[in-house]
Amino acid sequence: FGDVEKAIDGCEYVYHFAGQADIGFSSKSPVESIKNNILGTLNLLELARKYEVERFLFASTIYVYSELGSFYRVSKQSCEKIIEEYQKEFGLNYTILRYGSLYGPRANDFNAMKHFLTQAIKEKKITRNGNGEELREYIHVKDASSLSITALKKQYRNQHLFITGNQQIRVKDLLKMISEIFDNKIEIHFDSNRDTHHYEITPFNFKPQIAKKIIPETFYDLGQGILDLIYDLDAKINNVNNSEILNSK
């Protein structure tokens, strides 16, 4: 806590990206997930208030629109309401960043895109829960980070922003794209046991305060973003140079 306080002292803006973000873990460990996400956020809010931070930017999720997402969604909904109340009571300005399906370098192991590509590289096959009809709007982390900086503009103060991709794709088509990148040498299997913690077509059924969607003027093409991530993951998994991967298929 002391190191965090030292880091915040003198800051104009605080981005709060820390937290437990694995939906699967949260469904099995609700106490740990809620303590981590809610109490961690409260600690940062108190420090932001103490040092009169100009604005508190919070990484939330599109799952706040949903009844899915297990205790991960519950913790993010709770944090949003707490942040809003801090603004009412103490004048601490905020911006809520509701992220969609992120992908890119340095992703956690539970990240869907990383999971797909790791399976493809290691096993030459991809197994997916569901039938592949699920719709997603993947956004590259570089685009998301750019929009997170854009969120500092005055018009986004005390606003809720919806940050997701502008290329909608079905999961089955995404997996086909990945297979084609590997010269169709990847087997694709769908498990009929649907993951009940994730949405299929849309997360919109909860009805929170409506968010504004912001999109970059230029953005990563999904195919190019996937190819770049394959190079990155293969280098880490097989300890090879990026130029070797597709030539060694």
Regions found by a protein language model. Name each.
Residues F1-R98:
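N-terminal Rossmann-like NAD(P)+-binding domain of SDR-like oxidoreductases, especially those catalyzing
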Residues G2-D3, G104, R194-H198:
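A short acidic, often aromatic-flanked loop/helix-cap motif at beta-alpha or helix-coil junctions
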Residues G2-E5, G24, V31, L42, ...:
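Residues in well-ordered alpha-helical elements
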Residues S26, G100-S101, H160-I163:
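Short-chain dehydrogenase/reductase
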Residues L44, I83, F116, P208-K212:
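Structural element of the ATP-grasp superfamily
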Residues Y63, S101, Q168:
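PG/GG-rich flexible active-site loop of Rossmann-like NAD(P)H-dependent oxidoreductases
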Residues F71-R73, Q77, K81-R136, V141-T150, ...:
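NAD(P)-dependent short-chain dehydrogenase/reductase
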Residues K124-K249:
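C-terminal substrate-binding subdomain of Rossmann-fold SDR/epimerase-dehydratase oxidoreductases
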